[in-house]
């Protein structure tokens, strides 16, 4: 069985401030001297430099830990007349190691199709970033028992465009749309069922990838339900939304992941 290091990735969405970043580091910089879990901070792009500076300033306090920086989105294009967009190279230059791709809010609010998501996945890897690929079903799809079908379609398009081995340098986040920002989380059993399906799906084309890829759960994760979720055999941590904005809650989630 592969030893997959748990990950807790905090997606601030369009929230936070430079002051929040300082508060987070003040809270956990000296308490994360442990590399048993990886912590990724994904602030809005405007605050990436603030977080980068805090990582550097707290380098000694964070010694022995794995705290990284990630972005919430990137353009599928390398450069050009794309007002408001940020390229993979720009994110790499900013110090990012990870980037969230295909979040349900991007798909739903900004019309990102699975083809665009696959292109962004490729753009991330082209510039040395590790994509955190989000997949998940809507409430109606779950009620219609189409969860596996929807997720398979979302995975397959990325595989078709990028190849299976592209997942050797990728993270997957299962985020059921009916749980994102609703306060209603999937049960540990529901999460495990879907994570096991994703792992099996990838194992069919590459046993190595299937066994080693990290699969995060995202959708109303809190300190009260994280231990049970992270204890599932195919759940390798969480993509955290609201709780990542609360320094105490986020530290609790990191601590839970470190003992999972």
UniProtKB/Swiss-Prot annotation:
Enzyme active site: 103 (electrophile), 175 (proton acceptor)
Pfam families for the chain: TIM (PF00121)
Keyword field: Cytoplasm, Gluconeogenesis, Glycolysis, Isomerase
The protein's Enzyme Commission number: 5.3.1.1
The keyword Membrane is assigned to this record: no
GO CC term (a single one): cytosol
Biological process per Gene Ontology, one example term: gluconeogenesis
Gene3D superfamilies with a match to the protein in the record: Aldolase class I
Subcellular location as annotated: Cytoplasm
Enzyme class: isomerase
GO molecular function list: triose-phosphate isomerase activity
Binding site for substrate: 11-13, 181, 220, 241-242
Recorded catalytic activity of this chain's protein: D-glyceraldehyde 3-phosphate = dihydroxyacetone phosphate
UniProt pathway: Carbohydrate biosynthesis; gluconeogenesis; Carbohydrate degradation; glycolysis; D-glyceraldehyde 3-phosphate from glycerone phosphate: step 1/1
Domain of life: Bacteria
Positions of disulphide bridges: none
Stored NCBIfam families: tim
Quaternary structure (record): Homodimer.
Family recorded in the similarity comment: Belongs to the triosephosphate isomerase family.
Job description of the protein: Involved in the gluconeogenesis. Catalyzes stereospecifically the conversion of dihydroxyacetone phosphate (DHAP) to D-glyceraldehyde-3-phosphate (G3P).
Protein name (record): Triosephosphate isomerase
Taxonomic lineage of the native organism: Bacteria, Pseudomonadati, Pseudomonadota, Gammaproteobacteria, Alteromonadales
Gene behind the chain: tpiA
């Amino acid at each position: 069985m592969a030893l997959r290091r748990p990950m807790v990735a905090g997606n601030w969405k369009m929230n936070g401030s430079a002051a929040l970043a300082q508060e987070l580091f003040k809270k956990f910089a000296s308490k994360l001297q442990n590399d048993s879990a990886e912590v990724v901070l994904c602030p809005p792009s405007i605050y990436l430099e603030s977080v980068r500076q805090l990582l550097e300033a707290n380098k000694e306090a964070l010694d022995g830990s794995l705290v990284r920086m990630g972005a919430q989105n990137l353009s599928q294009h390398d450069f050009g007349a794309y007002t408001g967009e940020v390229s993979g190279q720009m994110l790499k230059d900013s110090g990012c190691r990870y980037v969230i791709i295909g979040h349900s809010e991007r798909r739903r609010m900004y019309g990102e199709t699975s083809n665009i998501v696959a292109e962004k996945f490729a753009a991330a890897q082209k510039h040395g970033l590790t994509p955190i690929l989000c997949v998940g079903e809507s409430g109606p799809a779950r009620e219609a028992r189409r969860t596996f079908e929807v997720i398979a379609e979302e995975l397959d398009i990325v595989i078709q465009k990028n190849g299976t081995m592209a997942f050797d340098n990728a993270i997957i986040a299962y985020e059921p749309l009916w749980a994102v920002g609703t306060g209603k989380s999937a049960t540990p059993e529901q999460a495990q069922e879907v994570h096991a399906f994703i792992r099996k799906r990838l194992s069919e084309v590459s046993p190595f990838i299937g066994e080693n890829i990290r699969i995060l759960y995202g959708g109303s994760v809190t300190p009260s339900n994280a231990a049970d979720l992270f204890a599932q055999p195919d759940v390798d941590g969480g993509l955290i939304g609201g709780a990542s904005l609360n320094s105490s809650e986020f530290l609790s989630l990191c601590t839970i992941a470190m003992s999972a």
